[in-house]
UniProtKB/Swiss-Prot annotation:
Gene3D superfamilies: Chorismate lyase-like. InterPro entries: Chorismate--pyruvate_lyase, Chorismate_lyase_/UTRA_dom_sf. Its main location: cytoplasm. It catalyses: chorismate = 4-hydroxybenzoate + pyruvate. This is Probable chorismate pyruvate-lyase. The gene is ubiC. GO terms for molecular function: chorismate lyase activity. It is found in: Cytoplasm. Removes the pyruvyl group from chorismate, with concomitant aromatization of the ring, to provide 4-hydroxybenzoate (4HB) for the ubiquinone pathway. The lineage of its organism: Bacteria, Pseudomonadati, Pseudomonadota, Alphaproteobacteria, Hyphomicrobiales. Pathway: Cofactor biosynthesis; ubiquinone biosynthesis. It comes from Bartonella bacilliformis (strain ATCC 35685 / KC583 / Herrer 020/F12,63). Belongs to the UbiC family.
Length: 171
Protein backbone atom coordinates (compact mmCIF):
# COMPACT_ATOMS: atom_id res chain seq x y z
CA UNK A 1 0.00 0.00 0.00
CA UNK A 2 3.00 2.31 -0.02
CA UNK A 3 4.48 4.21 -2.95
CA UNK A 4 6.02 2.08 -5.65
CA UNK A 5 5.81 4.17 -8.84
CA UNK A 6 6.02 7.73 -10.13
CA UNK A 7 2.99 9.93 -10.75
CA UNK A 8 0.98 9.60 -13.96
CA UNK A 9 0.73 13.41 -14.01
CA UNK A 10 3.54 15.37 -15.64
CA UNK A 11 4.79 18.54 -13.92
CA UNK A 12 2.21 21.30 -14.39
CA UNK A 13 2.63 25.07 -14.67
CA UNK A 14 0.15 26.84 -12.38
CA UNK A 15 -1.13 30.20 -13.62
CA UNK A 16 -1.66 33.27 -11.46
CA UNK A 17 -5.26 33.98 -10.43
CA UNK A 18 -5.36 37.10 -12.61
CA UNK A 19 -4.08 35.35 -15.77
CA UNK A 20 -6.38 36.21 -18.68
CA UNK A 21 -4.92 33.80 -21.25
CA UNK A 22 -7.59 31.13 -20.72
CA UNK A 23 -10.15 31.04 -23.56
CA UNK A 24 -13.72 31.55 -22.24
CA UNK A 25 -15.00 28.09 -23.29
CA UNK A 26 -12.01 26.41 -21.59
CA UNK A 27 -12.40 28.62 -18.51
CA UNK A 28 -16.03 27.51 -18.19
CA UNK A 29 -14.90 23.88 -18.01
CA UNK A 30 -12.03 24.54 -15.63
CA UNK A 31 -14.22 26.46 -13.19
CA UNK A 32 -16.93 23.76 -13.12
CA UNK A 33 -18.23 23.61 -9.55
CA UNK A 34 -20.31 20.47 -10.02
CA UNK A 35 -19.20 16.96 -10.83
CA UNK A 36 -16.84 16.75 -13.81
CA UNK A 37 -18.00 13.14 -14.22
CA UNK A 38 -21.59 14.32 -14.74
CA UNK A 39 -20.44 16.96 -17.21
CA UNK A 40 -18.44 14.38 -19.15
CA UNK A 41 -21.48 12.09 -19.31
CA UNK A 42 -23.19 14.62 -21.60
CA UNK A 43 -20.54 13.84 -24.24
CA UNK A 44 -20.50 10.05 -24.30
CA UNK A 45 -22.49 6.93 -23.50
CA UNK A 46 -20.12 5.65 -20.80
CA UNK A 47 -17.68 7.25 -18.37
CA UNK A 48 -15.44 4.95 -16.40
CA UNK A 49 -12.28 5.10 -14.33
CA UNK A 50 -9.10 3.08 -14.70
CA UNK A 51 -7.19 3.29 -11.40
CA UNK A 52 -3.42 3.49 -11.89
CA UNK A 53 -2.04 4.11 -8.38
CA UNK A 54 -3.61 3.77 -4.94
CA UNK A 55 -1.30 3.84 -1.92
CA UNK A 56 -0.09 5.85 1.06
CA UNK A 57 2.63 8.46 0.73
CA UNK A 58 4.53 10.56 3.26
CA UNK A 59 4.37 14.36 3.43
CA UNK A 60 7.82 14.73 1.85
CA UNK A 61 6.45 13.05 -1.30
CA UNK A 62 3.79 15.74 -1.78
CA UNK A 63 6.15 18.37 -3.22
CA UNK A 64 4.17 21.61 -3.86
CA UNK A 65 0.94 19.88 -2.83
CA UNK A 66 2.09 20.06 0.80
CA UNK A 67 1.28 23.77 0.98
CA UNK A 68 -2.37 22.98 0.20
CA UNK A 69 -2.92 20.30 2.84
CA UNK A 70 -2.55 20.12 6.63
CA UNK A 71 0.16 18.11 8.39
CA UNK A 72 -0.64 14.42 8.47
CA UNK A 73 1.37 11.30 9.20
CA UNK A 74 0.26 9.78 5.88
CA UNK A 75 -1.73 10.72 2.78
CA UNK A 76 -3.75 8.43 0.54
CA UNK A 77 -2.81 8.91 -3.12
CA UNK A 78 -5.17 7.87 -5.89
CA UNK A 79 -4.30 8.39 -9.54
CA UNK A 80 -6.73 7.46 -12.29
CA UNK A 81 -7.45 7.81 -15.97
CA UNK A 82 -11.04 8.90 -16.58
CA UNK A 83 -12.33 7.49 -19.85
CA UNK A 84 -15.22 8.60 -22.07
CA UNK A 85 -16.35 5.83 -24.43
CA UNK A 86 -12.97 4.15 -23.90
CA UNK A 87 -11.01 7.31 -24.84
CA UNK A 88 -8.72 8.78 -22.16
CA UNK A 89 -10.14 12.20 -21.28
CA UNK A 90 -8.57 13.11 -17.95
CA UNK A 91 -5.73 12.19 -15.61
CA UNK A 92 -6.77 12.63 -12.00
CA UNK A 93 -4.65 12.75 -8.85
CA UNK A 94 -6.28 12.87 -5.43
CA UNK A 95 -4.30 13.35 -2.21
CA UNK A 96 -6.21 12.75 1.02
CA UNK A 97 -4.83 13.29 4.54
CA UNK A 98 -5.24 10.29 6.83
CA UNK A 99 -7.56 12.32 9.09
CA UNK A 100 -9.96 12.92 6.19
CA UNK A 101 -9.96 9.18 5.45
CA UNK A 102 -10.70 8.30 9.07
CA UNK A 103 -13.61 10.76 9.18
CA UNK A 104 -15.22 8.86 6.29
CA UNK A 105 -14.58 5.31 7.53
CA UNK A 106 -11.84 4.92 4.91
CA UNK A 107 -14.49 4.79 2.14
CA UNK A 108 -12.27 7.02 -0.03
CA UNK A 109 -9.64 4.25 -0.06
CA UNK A 110 -12.09 1.76 -1.52
CA UNK A 111 -13.47 3.59 -4.56
CA UNK A 112 -11.93 1.16 -7.05
CA UNK A 113 -13.35 2.01 -10.49
CA UNK A 114 -15.93 4.43 -9.06
CA UNK A 115 -15.28 8.03 -10.16
CA UNK A 116 -14.38 10.24 -7.19
CA UNK A 117 -17.16 12.68 -8.10
CA UNK A 118 -19.82 10.00 -7.65
CA UNK A 119 -18.77 9.63 -4.01
CA UNK A 120 -18.08 13.30 -3.27
CA UNK A 121 -21.19 14.79 -4.83
CA UNK A 122 -23.54 12.17 -3.36
CA UNK A 123 -22.32 13.00 0.14
CA UNK A 124 -24.03 16.39 0.45
CA UNK A 125 -21.33 17.81 2.74
CA UNK A 126 -18.90 18.93 0.02
CA UNK A 127 -17.40 22.42 -0.29
CA UNK A 128 -14.62 23.76 -2.50
CA UNK A 129 -12.03 26.21 -1.17
CA UNK A 130 -10.58 27.18 -4.57
CA UNK A 131 -9.73 26.16 -8.12
CA UNK A 132 -6.27 26.88 -9.55
CA UNK A 133 -5.77 26.72 -13.32
CA UNK A 134 -2.67 25.22 -14.87
CA UNK A 135 -1.17 23.92 -18.09
CA UNK A 136 1.12 21.32 -19.55
CA UNK A 137 2.03 22.50 -23.04
CA UNK A 138 -1.32 22.74 -24.90
CA UNK A 139 -3.26 20.80 -22.25
CA UNK A 140 -5.25 22.49 -19.48
CA UNK A 141 -5.37 21.44 -15.84
CA UNK A 142 -7.01 22.44 -12.60
CA UNK A 143 -6.33 21.87 -8.92
CA UNK A 144 -9.06 22.10 -6.27
CA UNK A 145 -8.96 21.84 -2.53
CA UNK A 146 -12.23 20.27 -1.52
CA UNK A 147 -13.64 19.70 1.93
CA UNK A 148 -15.77 16.71 2.75
CA UNK A 149 -17.54 17.28 6.07
CA UNK A 150 -14.99 20.05 6.63
CA UNK A 151 -11.98 17.74 6.08
CA UNK A 152 -9.62 18.61 3.17
CA UNK A 153 -8.49 16.71 0.10
CA UNK A 154 -6.64 17.91 -2.98
CA UNK A 155 -7.75 17.00 -6.50
CA UNK A 156 -5.61 17.71 -9.58
CA UNK A 157 -7.05 17.06 -13.05
CA UNK A 158 -5.25 17.22 -16.40
CA UNK A 159 -7.60 17.32 -19.39
CA UNK A 160 -6.19 15.15 -22.18
CA UNK A 161 -6.33 16.02 -25.90
CA UNK A 162 -9.47 13.93 -26.60
CA UNK A 163 -11.40 15.54 -23.74
CA UNK A 164 -14.61 17.38 -24.72
CA UNK A 165 -13.13 20.42 -22.97
CA UNK A 166 -11.41 21.11 -26.29
CA UNK A 167 -14.56 20.74 -28.43
CA UNK A 168 -17.91 22.50 -28.74
CA UNK A 169 -20.90 21.78 -26.48
CA UNK A 170 -23.08 18.84 -27.61
CA UNK A 171 -26.26 20.97 -27.90
Amino acid sequence: MFRTEDSILPPLEWLSDNNSSVPPAIYDWLMELGSMTLRFERYCTRVHVEPRHEYFIARNELKEEAEHLPESSLYWLREVVLMGDNQPWLLGRTVIPQETLAHHSNALMNLGTLPLGRYLFSNGELTRDYIHIGRKDSLWARRSRLRLSGKPLLLTELFLADSPLYTEDPS
